[in-house]
A protein has these predicted regions:
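Conserved ABC ATPase signature
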Residues: 140-144, 148
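Short, conserved post-Walker A segment of ABC-type ATPase nucleotide-binding domains
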Residues: 34, 45-58
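A short, flexible loop at the N-terminus of ABC-type nucleotide-binding domains that lies
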Residues: 1-4, 9-23, 29-30, 55-60, ...
Length: 156
């Protein structure tokens, strides 16, 4: 579950072009699917940064209110704990990849968490089946279409 309670955030001086958000309230229940849409600059990216912990752990600014993910305050959790349950896929995900090939990118998260090799192989096989990625395995990420890159980002 994700809950945003009366959150106002304004970016610091290093990011003056972003305006932030004012008095946002949002509840997303387990299993619920939402879409954030709106004009450029309306706060969509800021809301995702609040949920995934990049705000307040990476982006500086002034924040009031609280963001909760699975009953824990995002501001009090290490960002790596929040990243275990929350992820974001950018419109153009090229800047969020850590590897050049698709297979390594998909397994990166499991490797980073120190999961056993056998478990990683099993999860890779299941993910490839579930996302129907067979034709994308072992390919250079930078030779994929935008939609294919987004699929790899979701799978990872």
């Amino acid at each position: 579950m994700i809950r945003i309670d009366h959150v106002t955030f304004s970016y610091g001086e290093e990011n003056e072009s972003a305006s932030g958000v004012q008095d946002i309230n949002l509840n997303i229940e387990d299993g619920q699917f939402i879409v954030l849409c709106g004009e450029s600059g309306c706060g969509k990216t800021t809301i995702t940064r609040l949920i995934n912990g990049l705000i307040p752990h990476y982006y500086e600014g002034k924040m009031n209110g609280e963001v909760w993910v699975n009953g824990a305050k995002v501001s009090e959790q290490p960002i790596y704990d929040t990243a275990k349950t929350v992820g974001s896929v950018f419109q153009n995900p090229r800047s969020q990849f850590f590897n050049v090939d698709t297979t390594s990118e998909i397994t990166f998260g499991c490797e980073n968490l120190g999961q056993p090799e056998q478990s990683i192989r099993e999860r890779l096989e299941k993910t490839v089946r579930d996302f129907r990625l067979e034709k994308l395995m072992g390919r250079n990420i930078f030779h994929l279409s935008g939609g294919e890159k987004q699929k790899i980002a979701c799978a990872g």
